[in-house]
Curated annotation (Swiss-Prot):
It comes from the Eukaryota. The modification Phosphothreonine is found at T402, T419. Pathway: Protein modification; protein ubiquitination. It is an enzyme of class 2 (transferase). The lineage of its organism: Eukaryota, Metazoa, Chordata, Craniata, Vertebrata. Residues 389-405 have a biased composition (Polar residues). E3 ubiquitin-protein ligase that plays a key role in innate antiviral immunity by mediating ubiquitination of CGAS and STING1. In response to pathogen- and host-derived double-stranded DNA (dsDNA), targets STING1 to 'Lys-63'-linked ubiquitination, thereby promoting its homodimerization, a step required for the production of type I interferon IFN-beta. Also mediate monoubiquitination of CGAS, thereby promoting CGAS oligomerization and subsequent activation. Independently of its E3 ubiquitin ligase activity, positive regulator of TLR3 signaling. A zinc finger (RING-type) spans 21-60. Belongs to the TRIM/RBCC family. This is E3 ubiquitin-protein ligase TRIM56.
Length: 732
């Protein structure tokens, strides 16, 4: 692209699409120029003309059509000259039909003329060698420039040919345009000069150009200035759009983090209230059990004494009754005087008090404001802004400055997301009216009236670890299910989709990450899928003691029998997607797409034969195998040859058996600890880094996990619910 200050070259004009019509995409024919300076073929413009108006196909400017039609639009002699040069260069082929001399037929020679070897740039004629040698021997042609025809066709003399080229008069063929009629602003040849323009003042073309060039150059300079301003404005508009997108991304992050922290606080309050309720009910049940035991004992004693007295009175003889009268009367008086409280003991019934503001549709925990930012044009102001801080920081309408991530009073995490329990007044800045802000403050303070004593999650090293962002949650039970789902396997299934192995309902269900049900992959009759992995257009799963490979229509490609020494067999797809690994009684077997055994190894080598039991298995993008070893009660990481890269069996497992494992795109390992409702994170070599998910995140008996697209951790719970968390990396 030619810059504003530089002049375009002739080569660029001839080689670019400048000479092509933007309508028919062919070389211009009878070029006509519109007032907007766009040039098209005359026939193409005639097809676009609608009545008295015509709209330019490029700039969409509407121009009036002259009464005489599109033929009356100004002829573009500049384009005509370039087209003549291009046609002259392209005329004839030196290898096929050689061009003939243009002078030989005029001098009475052969009718066709000899083969041309040269060209006169002034006459625009091809010449044979003889005519070329004598062409400059006359007074009229002495100054003509005769050049080699091959070099002319190659473009070596384009500049000279252009300088010596003369525009031809459209009214008088063969006559060059030589004059400019000043009153009519029309180009004239000698014949035109002698007819209607004889009395008009005319100037030679060179003199007319010298007179009019300064005015055009001045106008061009003004347009160049406008172009510079337009370019600066365009760049400023792009920068403003980039700032808008950047700020929008920040707001999205703030909304996600604020929502996450509010959800955490709400879940903590949920656990706290449920704990209090559980403790109250257990204490009440314990007291009730003690009272019921005492009452049942007293009731049994009284019932037995009363039954004995009734038998004596109804069946005994007079002497027998009188002999037992004293003992019976004493016992009955004793039972009547036994202390007991009629009616049930006082019981405190629990009642839930829900803050009414949360159900109010006008209660906005998140509120968005838009601040207009004036453009900065003064470079001095820009410099002051760069030295004195970020002056483009948005302010609210009442002049209060929005907190920045660089403020020293808060960490970046705290400055981006404020929960009601931390700072009830922080949210007040988003309102535009003071009474609304005070009302909103009061709502948030009411919510945070009593801080929750429930312990939060273990965030040891959280500033250095990937962080979870809650994405969505959905159930997996479908209307056709006969039993409650029991999810035993998960795997990614294409982009943003998961495949769920429901062993209880003997189904492989497809869900999007948003929880939309996408149907099911049919499984063979009687199969209950346990572990599942997706390969290239196929699905591998284990059921009982068999490994199956099926296509998406449920057709079995092959099946392999596995060892019966293991209750379940974990299945994992290799990163290449063309092999599947399965854990079989302490070792790992890898099968290719044809069902042939590609390799088999024991983690740690043959010395560990019989010492391993991999219940869960996955692979990393780096090609490593990661498994949960229930016999060693450890998490083991090994390479493709079975060499152990790392193994963890430390206190971070809390004495639990390691559960399901998943690996993100950077190699971080996510290990499920079902007994303590946790998912911990380990580095690619198996060293524990800290907790990733806890009951604080809503985990309740997590069963299996998988990683989708390397950044979404999908966790299934024992009740058939699936939670999806987005893994925020360190460099986010």
């Amino acid at each position: 692209m030619v810059s504003q200050g530089s002049s375009p070259s002739l080569l660029e004009a001839l080689s670019s699409d400048f000479l092509a019509c933007k309508i028919c995409l062919e070389q211009l024919r009878v070029p006509k120029t519109l007032p907007c300076l766009h040039t098209y073929c005359q026939d193409c413009l005639a097809q676009l003309a609608e009545g008295s108006r015509l709209r330019c196909p490029e700039c969409r400017e509407s121009v009036p059509v002259p009464p005489a039609g599109v033929a009356a639009f100004k002829t573009n002699f500049f384009v005509n000259g370039l087209l003549d040069l291009v046609k002259a260069r392209a005329g004839g082929d030196l290898r096929a039909g050689k061009p003939a001399c243009a002078l030989c037929p005029l001098m009475g020679g052969a009718s066709a003329g000899g083969p041309a070897t040269a060209r006169c740039l002034d006459c625009a004629d091809d010449l044979c060698q003889a005519c070329a040698d004598g062409h400059r021997c006359t007074r009229q042609t002495h100054s003509h420039r005769v050049v080699d025809l091959v070099g002319y066709r190659a473009g070596w003399y384009d500049e000279e040919a252009r300088e010596r080229q003369a525009a031809q008069c459209p009214q008088h063929p063969g006559e060059a345009l030589r004059f400019l009629c000043q009153p009519c602003s029309q180009l004239l040849c000698r014949e035109c000069r002698l007819d209607p323009h004889l009395d008009h003042p005319c100037l030679p073309l060179a003199e007319a150009v010298r007179a009019r060039r300064p005015g055009l150059e001045e106008l061009l300079a003004g347009v160049d200035n406008n172009l510079a301003e337009l370019e600066a404005t365009r760049l400023a508009e792009k920068e403003a759009l980039a700032r808008l997108r950047e700020q929008a991304a920040k707001v999205v992050t703030q909304v996600e983090e604020a929502s996450e922290r509010v959800l955490r606080a709400l879940l903590a309050q949920k656990q706290e209230v449920l704990g209090q309720l559980r403790a109250h009910v257990e204490a009440a049940e314990e007291g009730a059990r003690e009272r019921l035991g005492e009452l049942e004992g007293q009731e049994q004693v009284a019932r037995e004494a009363a039954a004995f007295a009734r038998r004596v009175l109804s069946l005994g003889r007079e002497a027998e009754i009188l002999s037992l009268e004293g003992a019976i009367a004493q016992r009955l008086r004793q039972l009547q005087g036994c202390p007991w409280v009629p009616g049930p003991a006082p019981c405190q019934l629990p009642q839930l008090e829900l803050y009414p503001g949360l159900l109010d549709k006008n209660c906005h925990l998140l509120r968005l404001s838009f601040e207009e930012q004036l453009p900065q044009k003064d470079s001095g102001k820009d410099g002051a802004r760069s030295q004195g801080g970020d002056a483009t920081q948005p302010q609210s309408r009442d002049g209060v400055q929005t907190p920045n991530q660089e403020d020293g009073a808060k960490t970046p995490k705290e400055s981006r997301a404020q929960t009601p329990q931390e700072d009830g007044g922080t949210q007040a800045r988003v309102g535009s009216r003071s009474n609304k802000k005070r009302k909103f403050k009061g709502r948030l303070k009411s919510v945070s009236r009593e801080p929750s004593p429930a312990p939060g999650p273990n965030l040891e090293g959280s500033g250095l670890l990937p962080r979870p962002i809650f994405f969505c949650s959905f159930p997996t039970r479908m209307p056709g299910d006969k039993r409650a789902p029991r999810i035993t396997g998960l795997c990614p299934f294409g982009s943003r989709e998961i495949l769920v192995a429901d062993e209880q309902n003997r189904a492989l269900k497809r869900f999007s990450l948003n929880g939309d049900y996408r149907g099911a992959v049919p499984v063979p009759e009687g199969c209950s899928p346990c572990s599942v992995a997706a390969l290239q257009d196929t699905v591998a799963f284990s059921a009982a003691a068999r490994l199956y490979l099926i296509n998406h229509n449920g057709e079995v490609q092959w099946r392999r029998a596995l060892s019966l020494c293991q209750a379940s067999h974990a299945v994992a797809a290799m990163p290449s997607g063309d092999r599947v690994a399965v854990s079989v009684s302490g070792h790992v077997e890898v099968y290719n797409m044809e069902g042939s055994l590609a390799t088999r190894f024991i983690p740690g080598g043959k010395a560990n034969r019989g010492l391993r039991a991999l219940v869960f298995l996955t692979t990393s993008p780096q090609g490593h195998f990661v498994g949960s070893d229930w016999q060693q009660n450890s998490l083991v990481v090994c390479d493709g040859l079975g060499q152990v890269v790392g193994e963890y069996r430390g206190p971070g497992l809390h004495g639990c058996q390691p559960g399901s494992v998943s690996v993100d795109k950077k190699g971080y390992i996510f290990l499920t600890l079902r007994e303590v409702n946790k998912v911990v994170i380990l580095d690619p070599k198996g060293s524990l880094l800290g907790d990733f998910l806890t009951a604080y995140h809503g985990l309740e008996k997590p069963r299996v996990t998988t990683m989708v697209d390397g950044r979404y951790l999908v966790v299934s719970l024992s009740n058939g619910t699936i939670h999806v968390f987005r893994v925020r990396p360190l460099d986010s």
